[in-house]
């Protein structure tokens, strides 16, 4: 049903003195009050339309087809809260107090009509049911959307002061707790054939009562270079995470893609039946420093070995189509790969001779998993990631929010917030799809601007 809203705006313009900036400034101030008034006009008009269709006009009822979906209410006195079949009402005025709802435009003060069912006598508000507003709801979901996006994009102080969103820190917590974002990841929804690599890492955060917590995340990198979130978990064992992640795969056969990690305990055999383990080439030398420090070496003593390791694992792969590369280019990479492995083996022997057992053990474990990306390229020509830098950036985004806003929150709530951050920042299509479904955007309402006309004011 099409209707029009006629708006009258009056402005006072100082001829020859006003500038564009002041005009835009005043219009910006008018935006939210104007949107609230338009919203209120639409809703009151909708309420009047429903009341007219549900009540007899000159003793004649509106055809049932025109009343379909309107006036639903629970039958009065029914112990099972079943719906009444009556769709005919008596108008009983309006509720004594206005209904206040938080919206993205501000506080909406809405008068609610009271209707009395002619069949069971129950009193209800047809508008609330038609708009899917629960009896005790005090906000609409676009407000929740605005708050969640603001939390992801900025810190709490700027959220309140910069965006003028009236909500407490506890209110943000309640929105995140009540979110159903954790239901977005259906089982068997990810095809391993679409992934170029999988990464996993963890970061610390402050739990309730000041205890230290561990937030862990697993992501996939698609062949198109996009992030495919595979799961975020708070204080969960890697073995349990592995089982949950596997349930998201359409198949769990070996895919020949690298699993990149920083050497964290518990990840050496993570997803070993579907991926090939690849140690992060940035964390590799860093870990050697710590191992040799445990052997008693200081930085100036271990630095030459660290520099040597960086050189050995820093094999650059030729760019371009693998099939078009010259045989000598491929052979050069393979020669460099074999010589690097041999030199690392020699370095391990040197460490053992000098009694650097921690360093030797570390290098032995590292050498088994540091060249996976090279081996994959030699077999298939696929250039896979070799560092966890992307996941590190994601954790920096998560850390800024979790450590400043979500400190002291429960594990489940921190998990939800981190999932929201990953989706919003790195999987925008899924994020938008989630909110469209949550907000019920189904094409049942549209509004557009028709025209603006300048008329003389009668006060001039």
Label each residue range with its predicted role.
Residues 212-215, 291-303:
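Short, surface-exposed amphipathic charged segments that create phosphate/polyanion-binding patches used
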Residues 2-74, 78-81, 251-278, 303-460:
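Acidic/histidine-rich catalytic cores and adjacent linkers
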Residues 2-16, 93-96, 107-108, 112-136, ...:
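RNase H-like nuclease fold core
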Residues 138-154:
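Short, amphipathic alpha-helical "recognition" segments used to contact nucleic acids or chromatin
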Residues 267, 285-288, 301:
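The catalytic "switch" region of P-loop NTPases
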């Amino acid at each position: 049903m099409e209707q029009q809203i006629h708006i009258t705006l009056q402005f006072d313009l100082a001829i020859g003195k006003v500038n564009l900036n002041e005009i835009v400034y005043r219009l910006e101030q008018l935006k939210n009050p104007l949107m609230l008034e338009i919203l209120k006009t639409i809703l009151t008009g909708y309420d009047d339309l429903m009341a007219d269709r549900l009540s007899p006009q000159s003793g004649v009822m509106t055809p049932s087809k025109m009343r379909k979906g309107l006036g639903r209410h629970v039958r009065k006195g029914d112990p099972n809260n079943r719906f009444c079949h009556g769709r005919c009402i008596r108008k009983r005025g309006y509720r004594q107090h206005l209904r206040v709802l938080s919206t993205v435009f501000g506080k909406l003060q809405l008068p609610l009509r009271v209707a009395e069912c002619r069949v069971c006598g129950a009193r209800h508000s047809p508008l609330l049911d038609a708009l899917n507003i629960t009896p005790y709801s005090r906000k609409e979901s676009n407000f929740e959307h605005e708050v969640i996006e603001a939390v992801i994009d900025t810190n709490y102080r700027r959220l309140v002061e910069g965006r003028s969103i009236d909500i407490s820190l506890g209110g943000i917590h309640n929105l995140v707790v009540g979110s159903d974002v954790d239901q977005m990841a259906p089982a068997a929804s990810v095809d391993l054939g679409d992934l170029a690599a999988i990464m996993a890492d963890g970061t610390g955060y402050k739990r309730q009562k000041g205890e230290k917590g561990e937030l862990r995340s697993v992501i996939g990198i698609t062949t198109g270079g996009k992030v495919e979130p595979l799961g975020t978990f708070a204080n969960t064992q890697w073995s349990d995470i592995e089982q949950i992640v596997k349930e998201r795969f359409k198949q769990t056969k070996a895919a020949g893609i690298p699993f990149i990690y920083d050497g964290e305990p518990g990840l050496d055999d993570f997803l070993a039946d579907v991926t090939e383990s690849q140690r992060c080439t940035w964390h590799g030398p860093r870990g050697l420093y710590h191992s040799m420090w445990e052997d008693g070496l200081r930085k100036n003593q271990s630095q030459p070995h660290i520099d040597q390791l960086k050189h050995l694992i820093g094999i650059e792969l030729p760019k371009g189509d693998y099939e078009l590369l010259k045989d000598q280019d491929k052979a050069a990479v393979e020669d460099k790969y074999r010589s690097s492995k041999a030199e690392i083996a020699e370095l391990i022997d040197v460490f053992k001779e000098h009694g650097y057992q921690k360093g030797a053990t570390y290098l032995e474990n590292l050498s088994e998993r540091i060249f996976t990306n090279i081996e994959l390229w030699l077999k298939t020509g696929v250039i896979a990631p070799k560092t966890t830098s992307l996941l590190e950036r994601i954790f920096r985004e998560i850390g800024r929010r979790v450590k400043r806003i979500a400190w002291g929150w429960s594990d489940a709530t921190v998990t939800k917030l981190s999932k929201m951050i990953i989706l919003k920042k790195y999987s925008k299509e899924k994020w938008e799809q989630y909110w469209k479904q949550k907000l019920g955007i189904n094409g049942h309402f549209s509004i557009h601007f028709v025209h603006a006309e300048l008329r003389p004011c009668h006060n001039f």
